[in-house]
Curated annotation (Swiss-Prot):
It is a peripheral membrane protein. NDH-1 can be composed of about 15 different subunits; different subcomplexes with different compositions have been identified which probably have different functions. Its main location: membrane. It is found in: Cellular thylakoid membrane. InterPro entries: NdhO (IPR020905). Belongs to the complex I NdhO subunit family. It catalyses: a plastoquinone + NADH + (n+1) H(+)(in) = a plastoquinol + NAD(+) + n H(+)(out); a plastoquinone + NADPH + (n+1) H(+)(in) = a plastoquinol + NADP(+) + n H(+)(out). Its EC number is 7.1.1.-. One of its GO terms (cellular component) is plasma membrane-derived thylakoid membrane. Keywords: Membrane, NAD, NADP, Plastoquinone, Quinone, Thylakoid, Translocase, Transport. This is NAD(P)H-quinone oxidoreductase subunit O.
Length: 85
C-alpha cells in the first residue's frame, strides 16, 4: 500500500493577541451558550457587545475587562473577546 504524501493544511492566521490595556468587546457568537453566559443575566447588556471595554489583566485564558460605565469589572475567556475597532 503506497502512502501519498499529505500536504500540510495552510495555517490560519491567528487573530492578534490581546494585551493589557487593549480596547475590546465581546464576540456574541463565542459568548452565547458559554458557562459565563449561563452564570450571568439571561439578557446580556448591549454595551458588552458594542464596546469598548479596557482589558485590565490577562491571567491564563481569562481577561478582566472594565467597561466605561459604573458597573463591576468582569472576567471573561480570552477567546470571547475581540479587539474593538
Amino acid at each position: 500500500m503506497a502512502e501519498t504524501p499529505s500536504s500540510p493544511a495552510p495555517a490560519a492566521k491567528a487573530p492578534p493577541a490581546l494585551k493589557k490595556g487593549a480596547l475590546v468587546r465581546v464576540n456574541r457568537a463565542a459568548y452565547e451558550g458559554s458557562v459565563e453566559a449561563g452564570a450571568s443575566d439571561p439578557h446580556p447588556p448591549a454595551y458588552i457587545f458594542e464596546g469598548p471595554g479596557e482589558l485590565l489583566v490577562v491571567k491564563g485564558t481569562y481577561g478582566q475587562v472594565r467597561w466605561r460605565r459604573p458597573v463591576p469589572d468582569v472576567w471573561l475567556r480570552m477567546d470571547q473577546l475581540e479587539a474593538f475597532s
